[in-house]
């Protein structure tokens, strides 16, 4: 049972336009990075391995391989640090959480592309 005031505040904070994506999709997240007095955008491209839908507390985890090392980053969906998100490729998977990809490497970690 949530308060109407809390619901109104959460709805106000969830105004950002989010593209539809699911686990298995390859996305590019543009993150605002502050270095000293200047700010720039940093792209983080990888496969969505988990998604958590909780209104304003929604989050998703993206995994990529950087210089042969697996890197995972969890983003808050409605964070002001995220400038934009774009879906590059739709993946055809049958699970909601793709944590098994952590144990796979190379060609075994590929995800089939969704055709339709």
Swiss-Prot record:
GO terms for biological process: translation. Keywords: Ribonucleoprotein, Ribosomal protein. It comes from the Bacteria. One of its GO terms (cellular component) is cytosolic large ribosomal subunit. InterPro entries: Ribosomal_bL19, Ribosomal_bL19_CS, Ribosomal_bL19_sf, Translation_prot_SH3-like_sf. The keyword Ribonucleoprotein applies. GO terms for molecular function: structural constituent of ribosome. Belongs to the bacterial ribosomal protein bL19 family. PANTHER family: LARGE RIBOSOMAL SUBUNIT PROTEIN BL19M, RIBOSOMAL PROTEIN L19. HAMAP family: Ribosomal_bL19. This protein is located at the 30S-50S ribosomal subunit interface and may play a role in the structure and function of the aminoacyl-tRNA binding site. This is Large ribosomal subunit protein bL19. The gene is rplS.
């Amino acid at each position: 049972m949530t308060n109407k005031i809390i619901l109104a505040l959460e709805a106000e904070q969830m105004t950002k336009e989010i593209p539809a994506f699911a686990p298995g999709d390859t996305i590019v997240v543009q993150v605002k990075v502050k270095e000293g007095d200047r700010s720039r955008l940093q792209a983080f491209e990888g496969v969505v391995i988990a998604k958590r839908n909780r209104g304003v507390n929604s989050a998703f985890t993206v995994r990529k391989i950087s210089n042969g090392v697996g890197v995972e980053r969890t983003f808050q969906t409605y964070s002001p640090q995220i400038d934009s998100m774009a879906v590059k490729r739709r993946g055809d998977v049958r699970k909601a959480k793709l944590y098994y990809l952590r144990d796979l490497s190379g060609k075994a970690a590929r995800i089939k592309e969704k055709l339709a």
